[in-house]
């Protein structure tokens, strides 16, 4: 099954690095995406805000120069934010590659 997503946008928030119980560093950034897409032959304005999850030293290192307001492109996979409550209904993008655009 396919689960791959590529988004560009502006970083609007950066949360502190935390560690999982297993000691893996993990950081959440918030990306705001705006674009025009075509759907059913009609141009449509698209706006979305999504949490980006960076896990591991390499991923967090790739975001070391990212600041609020930075334009970036990310690729990765979509997963639910958690297993209980409202988190089951929220999606996060788990980043596998990050490119600075500015």
Predicted regions located by residue number:
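Single-stranded nucleic acid-binding surfaces, predominantly the OB-fold ssDNA-binding core
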Residues: 1-102
